[in-house]
Amino acid sequence: MRKCKIFVGNSHPELGNMVCQRLGIEPAPCTLKKFANGETSVQIGVSVRDEDVYVIQSGSPSINDDIMELLILVSACRGGSARKITAVIPQFPYSKQCKMKRHRGAITARMLANLLVMAGADHVVSMDLHASQMQGFFTKPVDNLYGGPSLAKWIRENVEDYEDAVVVSKNPGGTKRVTALADSLKINFAMIHTDRRRSKDLYSQNKDLQQLKLRKQSMLRKNRPIIRQGDHPNEEENIILSNGIQTARIRNGHVIGDDEADDDEDAILESDSELHSIDGLDSHGLGGTYDAVDSEDEEEIPVLYREQLITLVGNVRGRSAIILDDMIDRPGSFISAAEHLVQNCGAKKVYVVATHGIFTGDCLEELEKSDAIDTIVVTNTYPISGERIAGSKKLVTIDVSPIFAECIRRDHYGESISVLFDSLAAL
């Protein structure tokens, strides 16, 4: 590839080097270091004048340092008269902060987009942005590549009887992503909903556990069809809107039985003033907020909401369940969803599948310890240490470097990259 330079940052050198290897070129030389006072220093060791420059820098545990390194690299290439600068960011940092959740908050993802453009980026390439609307944050072209085809290919090759499996969204905000994968695999899908407020109202008005059982039974109308008049007289048509609704209780992130006593009722019931203050937060148990375009589940659950109602809309009995999300950050919502699928809904196996394996803190270890989860599948857009990979028996990592390499090659030669968005392009 003539007139092309690829710089690999410190965030994920393994992925960057794999991309360069597939393209048959060496990473462009540059010196990345820190001064004694913590400032980042970047020195480019080659001319970039009139060259196509690609800077590969993903999210990482040292996220703020790596963002600064990316901005300085882009700015240095702009100062070196590069013809075009493309920031390749496999896992876009701060993507969860893509909307204002509280008054006086900041839309940090938009701010980062502005910083990239101001530094000199002409083009941005990423994969599975937390919300596709984030592409509108940029005033430059953005290519949001899909990890779904690679995940679908792995499912076809490794999930037994995948034709009978069910793709599950663990919150309402992820249904669009789930239905897209289910359509490409031609299999069924289901959705999990966790209601904090319903559980709170129930306990604040009825402290008797029997009331909870009665309410749950009223929700368990499995396969009850809706009858409507047919097209001809005396003809009725059965319309089944769903294959079943299974509801259970969650306490402190784990599914509990209906007959389990309320050990800490005082922790569940708070003063009226506290109830009023939390009612103002339009939040969702497993899915951040009730905004359907978002799917955050990593907010700390207040004491009041530690007991919740979790509901599956769909049928996974005797089937493999594939819980799909864009990233795995913290384990709580995945574990509670998997436990509900296995213990109450009869799932045969549970696969946790995501594009970005962030695994904050001991997330991977907690998922590993869960008996309800059989396999964890992620791509290598985010760096995972070799020690953690070696210590996990459930983790599977899919290499997506061919997708980024092909994207760079096609972009450099002015070819269309629409094939990378095709459901068959599981490279």
Curated annotation (Swiss-Prot):
Q: Where is it found, in Gene Ontology cellular component terms?
A: cytoplasm; cytoplasmic stress granule; ribose phosphate diphosphokinase complex
Q: Does the keyword Metal-binding apply?
A: yes
Give its localization: Cytoplasm
Molecular function in Gene Ontology: ATP binding; kinase activity; magnesium ion binding; ribose phosphate diphosphokinase activity
Q: Which keywords, in A-to-Z order, does the entry hold?
A: ATP-binding, Cytoplasm, Kinase, Magnesium, Metal-binding, Nucleotide biosynthesis, Nucleotide-binding, Phosphoprotein, Transferase
UniProt-annotated binding residues for Mg(2+): D128, H130, D143
GO annotation (BP), single: ribonucleoside monophosphate biosynthetic process
Which chemical reaction does it catalyze? Answer: D-ribose 5-phosphate + ATP = 5-phospho-alpha-D-ribose 1-diphosphate + AMP + H(+)
Question: Where, per the database record, does this protein carry Phosphoserine?
Answer: S199, S218, S271, S295
Q: Pathway membership of this protein?
A: Metabolic intermediate biosynthesis; 5-phospho-alpha-D-ribose 1-diphosphate biosynthesis; 5-phospho-alpha-D-ribose 1-diphosphate from D-ribose 5-phosphate (route I): step 1/1
Documented EC number(s): 2.7.6.1
The protein's matches in CDD domains, at most eight in alphabetical order, are given as: PRTases_typeI
Q: Kindly report the protein's main subcellular placement as a broad class.
A: cytoplasm
* PROSITE patterns (UniProt xref): PRPP_SYNTHASE
Which additional comment does the entry carry?
Present with 11700 molecules/cell in log phase SD medium.
Looking up PANTHER family in the UniProt record yields: RIBOSE-PHOSPHATE DIPHOSPHOKINASE (PTHR10210:SF57), RIBOSE-PHOSPHATE DIPHOSPHOKINASE FAMILY MEMBER (PTHR10210)
Q: What does this protein do?
A: 5-phosphoribose 1-diphosphate synthase involved in nucleotide, histidine, and tryptophan biosynthesis. Active in heteromultimeric complexes with other 5-phosphoribose 1-diphosphate synthases (PRS2, PRS3, PRS4 and PRS5).
Q: Which family does it belong to?
A: Belongs to the ribose-phosphate pyrophosphokinase family.
Official protein name in the record: Ribose-phosphate pyrophosphokinase 1
Organism of origin is Saccharomyces cerevisiae (strain ATCC 204508 / S288c)
